[in-house]
């Protein structure tokens, strides 16, 4: 029996979404304060995370996994776009210039652990990252472009989904796919729980970046920008 997983994920992660938006790094980002050094570290972190996720989901999709396979839309993949952004920020030798941070390593380890022990839970990770990127990508791209004085595509390919010309239609199809996965309510609950864990793993990456951001803009400005809590402006955008 199919369960309404899409709405359960949306409603069940609202609190975590708001908490993520209120981390210091994201709060400053949404207000247009973006430090390039911190941002490029985030791009590197995301590269390691998406590489792990796309390797595991691709493997499970290729073997016909009944739950993970259907959500593994290749047009969502971000690894190639992140490689282009890393080449912009670090140069063509970017592979030798980046290293995984402790928070990103913990995130990657969790992805591999879930893939090995309970692959269905990868759906929670997939939803948290990809649909968040697709829903808020253009807004975040515009903020980053203006804050770092970048060209139209310079270092911002991550936010571009060229293989998805109709984002609204894609998200409708994605929601329908979630709702038709062959899972029961107990598994749906576990997937929502894992999606919340994914939000917290993202928050750890953001919090890890705050030291660099404070060094760049100063404690006083950082405190001013982060003293008010946001209500969760992008919650309703997710699938």
Positions of the model-derived regions?
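Metal- and O2-centered redox machinery and metal/ROS homeostasis
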Residues: 1-239
């Amino acid at each position: 029996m199919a369960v309404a997983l899409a709405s359960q994920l949306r409603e069940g992660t609202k609190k975590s979404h708001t908490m993520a938006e209120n981390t210091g790094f994201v709060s400053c980002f949404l207000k247009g304060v973006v430090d390039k050094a911190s941002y490029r570290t985030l791009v590197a972190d995301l590269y390691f995370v998406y590489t792990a996720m796309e390797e595991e989901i691709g493997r499970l999709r290729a073997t016909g996994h009944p739950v993970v396979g259907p959500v593994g839309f290749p047009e969502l993949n971000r690894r190639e776009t992140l490689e282009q952004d890393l080449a912009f920020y670090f140069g063509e030798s970017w592979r030798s210039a980046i290293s995984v941070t402790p928070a990103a390593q913990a995130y990657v380890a969790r992805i591999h652990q879930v893939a090995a022990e309970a692959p269905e839970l990868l759906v929670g990770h997939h939803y948290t990252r990809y649909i968040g990127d697709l829903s808020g990508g253009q807004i975040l791209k515009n903020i980053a472009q203006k804050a770092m004085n970048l060209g139209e595509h310079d270092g911002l390919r991550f936010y571009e989904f060229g293989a998805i010309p109709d984002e609204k239609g894609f998200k409708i199809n994605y929601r329908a796919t979630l709702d038709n996965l062959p899972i029961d309510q107990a598994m749906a609950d576990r997937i929502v729980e894992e999606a919340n864990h994914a939000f917290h793993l993202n928050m750890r990456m953001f919090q890890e970046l705050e030291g660099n951001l404070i060094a760049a803009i100063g404690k006083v400005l950082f405190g001013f920008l982060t003293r008010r809590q946001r209500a969760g402006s992008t919650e309703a955008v997710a699938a």
